[in-house]
């Protein structure tokens, strides 16, 4: 990618108090070097060990009397009708690596990509998260029902269930949640091998900078997907606030003051990381700042598809009532849909050129780049209309979902690494949705030592 993106990978943690984690010592942070020897082998998706469902499925609801529409969700998509005169994403395959994508009448083209959670094919979704993400990418319009639609309704989706907060390993009653950086790496390899031109990842591992994770397999898989298979990879930046979210990071964070490391976002040369803004284009209060944030899209009070029916929903149920569906998880699929539109419109562009185009056509903040919105809020019409590829905006810094500390490790061999990831696998994927108010969910989604965040 650009030199500025490469430079943003070199970050130094500053002294900061992280809730429950003490004050980390400042030291340099960067992802492990890409080593193709860590690339997962091609294999049929399957859980690393037997699992069982331990939690009831997530409740989703539609607010009574509310009219759903595109305009309420994202100002940057207000020109979708004009965009669709140029492209609707036909011919593109977008992989959703998430909690599964349920079959829905408004998602007519879903390919079962496999299941790392249970014994399914990837098209079950007990958490609701993956289906919400998929709807934002590709929901077909239905003018007789509402004004909601996905960004790229003609794409084919590849559903890979990689994580769930509702399942747990058999024989481990203290563990809740499945999904880790190893299964994420395998899922990325699978998505690339299934021909995905765009891969959406709305989950992350979020850790103190002093405890950077050993995610070499994931790094190798990301490099394989981008450099070998020419896939665009889009990831959520992550959320702060509440026990089930990432530790906060200063809004003005620079590469010299990072306290929270995020994977896969810190592989900035391979991942387009997306922060969240509100309907007015202002950074969401929950969006996690970081020197690897590239662009932003609307992620507040979104509407999408129900995994348990044939309608649309806009609220998540919880112990204390329902809450709006919000989070950087739902900003990322806006950008994934846009990437698919660009790839359909300009099929000769490489993955890196598509990522650069999205950054270059965004509405840049006053400084050209900042840690909350990166190069700015995406502009779908500009991205698919311009024949030229402008230079990326000025970048000086670089972000992911629910917080999970990962202990620093020495350099283990593959067998040692598998053992260490056994504990990591027991951590819940913290759905990037802003669900901090759900007390029981917060306890479930924030493991004691390790985990992957999501929303």
Curated annotation (Swiss-Prot):
Positions of the UniProt region annotated as Disordered: 389-417
Listed InterPro entries: Peptidase_S8/S53_dom, Peptidase_S8/S53_dom_sf, Peptidase_S8_Asp-AS, Peptidase_S8_His-AS, Peptidase_S8_Ser-AS, Peptidase_S8_subtilisin-rel, T7SS_pept_S8A_mycosin
Entry EC no(s): 3.4.21.-
Class of enzymatic activity (EC top level): hydrolase
GO molecular function annotation: serine-type endopeptidase activity
Signal peptide extent: 1-25
Family as reported in the entry's similarity comment: Belongs to the peptidase S8 family.
Designated name of the protein: Mycosin-4
Species of provenance: Mycobacterium tuberculosis (strain ATCC 25618 / H37Rv)
């Amino acid at each position: 990618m650009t030199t500025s993106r490469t430079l943003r990978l070199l970050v130094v943690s500053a002294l900061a108090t992280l809730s429950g984690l003490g004050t980390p010592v400042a030291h340099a942070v960067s992802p492990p070097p890409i080593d193709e020897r860590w690339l997962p082998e091609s294999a049929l998706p399957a859980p690393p060990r037997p699992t069982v469902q331990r939690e009831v499925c997530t409740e989703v609801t539609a607010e009574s009397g509310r009219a759903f529409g595109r305009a309420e969700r994202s100002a940057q998509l207000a020109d979708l009708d004009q965009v669709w005169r140029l492209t609707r994403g036909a011919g593109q395959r977008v992989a959703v690596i998430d909690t599964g994508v349920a079959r829905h009448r408004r998602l007519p083209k879903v390919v079962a990509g496999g299941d790392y959670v249970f014994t399914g094919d990837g098209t079950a979704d007990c958490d609701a998260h993956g289906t919400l993400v998929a709807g934002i990418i590709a929901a077909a319009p239905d003018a007789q029902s509402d004004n909601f639609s996905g960004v790229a309704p003609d794409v084919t989706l590849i559903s890979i269930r990689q994580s769930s907060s509702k399942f747990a390993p058999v024989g481990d009653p203290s563990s809740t949640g499945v999904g880790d950086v190893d299964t994420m790496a395998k899922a990325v390899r699978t998505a690339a091998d299934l021909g995905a031109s765009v891969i959406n990842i709305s989950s992350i591992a979020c850790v103190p900078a002093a405890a950077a994770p050993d995610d070499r397999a994931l790094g190798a898989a990301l490099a394989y997907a981008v450099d070998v298979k020419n896939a665009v990879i889009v990831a959520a930046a992550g959320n702060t606030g509440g026990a089930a979210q990432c530790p906060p990071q200063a809004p003005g964070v620079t590469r010299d003051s990072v306290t929270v490391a995020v994977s896969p976002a810190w592989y900035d040369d391979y991942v387009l990381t997306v922060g969240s803004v509100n309907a007015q284009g202002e950074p969401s209060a929950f969006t996690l700042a970081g020197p690897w944030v590239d662009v932003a899209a609307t992620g507040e009070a979104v509407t999408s598809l129900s995994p348990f029916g044939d309608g649309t929903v806009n609220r998540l149920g919880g112990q204390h009532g329902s809450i709006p569906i919000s989070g950087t998880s739902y900003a990322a699929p806006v950008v994934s849909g846009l990437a698919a539109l660009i790839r359909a419109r300009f099929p000769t562009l490489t993955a890196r050129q598509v990522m650069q185009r999205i950054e270059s056509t965004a509405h840049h903040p006053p400084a050209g780049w900042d840690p909350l919105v990166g190069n700015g809020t995406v502009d779908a019409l500009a991205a698919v209309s311009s024949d030229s590829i402008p230079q990326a905006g000025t970048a000086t810094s670089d972000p992911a979902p629910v917080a999970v500390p990962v202990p620093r490790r020495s350099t283990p061999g593959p067998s040692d690494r598998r053992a260490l990831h056994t504990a990591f696998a027991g951590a819940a994927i913290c759905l990037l949705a802003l669900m901090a108010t759900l007390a029981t969910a917060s306890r479930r989604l924030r493991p004691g030592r390790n985990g992957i965040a999501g929303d």
